[in-house]
Amino acid sequence: MLERATRTIKTAGLLLAAYFVLNIVLRIVLPHSLELDEAEQSFFSQYLLAGYGPQPPFYNWMQYAVVSVTGISIGALIVPKNILLFLSYLFYGLAGRRVLKDEALAAVGMLALITLPQVSYMAQQDLTHTTALLFASSLFLYGFFRTLDRPDMASYLLLGLATGIGLISKYNFALMPVVALIAILPDAEWRRRALDWRMLAAITVALVIVLPHAVWLQGNLAFASSDTLVKMAAGSEPAGAVRIGKGLLAFLVAIIAFAALPVVIFAATFRRDFVRALSAGNRWTGMMERMMLASLAGIALIVLFTGSTTVRERWLDPFLLVLPIYFLAKMQAAGLDLSAGLRRFRPVLPVLMACVLIALGFRVVGAGLIGTYSRPNVPMAGFAREMTRQAEPALVIASDTYIGGNMRLQFPDVPVVIPDFPAPGIPAYAEAKGPVLIVWRGKKTATAADAVMPERFSSALTAAGIALQEIGSLSLPYYFGRQGDNFALGYAWVRPETR
């Protein structure tokens, strides 16, 4: 059965489609309290802007388009994400077919993406912008490999489309076309692909996609880069050898964490064939090696020049995504009979799928057993119900996008704002035609007394001339939580007649 499912990209795609449908069903069955990125998308989907903050806007634009048609719901947040992930696998398989020239092997390579934890588990858990990056990276690999294999206008346009989408998905994607160019320089035939006049069409497509955000970025560069720089520079070490050493060590650990599972699985299933293939190669494996080495060298230089002490595995997504195709191409180049290894490898794939689904479910329903709570465990529906027993809000002012996005899901017909977004201050307050509900978050495991308003939020309300009345706080038990483990929210009402 598994052999039939991996015979072609189409049959493997059907297996993947069923898997992603199960992921959608699982998330809909779990509590509808949102993860951090889900909440951000819920909140930002009220606006169509050229830029939203530290992350590029591709996913926000896609989410805005979906919500504009369907309205806000858990399905409107989850289904598009799973479609993007499905397309990531599909384009990866199509890229693999260009390299491997064997559709059955390409189908296995497509499914082998699930051996990368950053793709299979972390992207499902949250990470909306990383999901967009995975999609763009797979599309880029397909466009790039297709252009190298059999160039035509469609392949160049696809390459430009992928580059444009990638650049407005995650800023680290900017390294991808650079390392791709470096990787083909030693090959005279492939070098001509980069000098082909059709490359101008690819560049034009990419520029058209990027231009609106690039114009916004020009005036908001500090704002857009602040979050990334803070994450990269986290650490208390002064500048110098110790800081550089810590950064390079973090980089090495990230590489190992990213690549360890696929290396172990391929080595365990293909055994000696995997080891023997390490010394084999062809022009495709050489090109992929140069891509990976150039990208890792680029990241190492960034670590050195910025003094970064933090490198996260997901930052390596576009650069090491090619690993499963690379491993299969190496073994194919060695001229080995892979049938025995493939028989051992195929059963691993549904096992990993099941493990991902179980882990995603257990982290929520088993939270009380392990004592660590995820954001879906927070009883947002209960908070919304308790806060609005006496009145329905005409406007919700939230302390941050996490609270704002959850409130938007609970009150889909009510505008939700946070201070200083999308305009300075809270201009929506003056325009509200009814009661205004103000909400802020307390501590994770808390009593109602712990729902103290953040000082920054308090200052923003004061600056906007908002005087709070009817201040309250709530502490409700987590979904699937231990007795006594609560989450706290603070809230206040401002009535029209008292403003």
Swiss-Prot record:
Its main location: membrane. It is a multi-pass membrane protein. InterPro entries: LipidA_mod_glycosyltrf_83 (IPR050297), RgtA/B/C-like (IPR038731). It is an enzyme of class 2 (transferase). Keywords: Cell inner membrane, Cell membrane, Glycosyltransferase, Lipopolysaccharide biosynthesis, Membrane, Transferase, Transmembrane, Transmembrane helix. It comes from the Bacteria. GO terms for molecular function: galactosyltransferase activity; hexosyltransferase activity; pentosyltransferase activity. GO terms for cellular component: plasma membrane. GO terms for biological process: lipopolysaccharide biosynthetic process; lipopolysaccharide core region biosynthetic process. Pfam families: PMT_2 (PF13231). Pathway: Bacterial outer membrane biogenesis; LPS core biosynthesis. Its EC number is 2.4.1.-. It is found in: Cell inner membrane. Disruption phenotype: Cells lacking this gene produce a normal lipid A structure with GalA at the 4'-position but a modified LPS core structure as this gene deletion results in the complete absence of GalA on both the 4- and 5-positions of the outer Kdo residue and incomplete addition of GalA to the Man residue. The mutant cells are also more susceptible to deoxycholic acid when compared with the parent strain, and more resistant to the polycationic antimicrobial peptide PmxB. Involved in the modification of the lipopolysaccharide (LPS) inner core. Catalyzes the transfer of a galacturonic acid (GalA) residue to the 4-position of the outer Kdo (3-deoxy-D-manno-octulosonic acid) residue of the LPS inner core, using dodecaprenyl phosphate-GalA as the donor substrate. GalA addition by RgtA is required for RgtB activity. This is Lipopolysaccharide core galacturonosyltransferase RgtA.
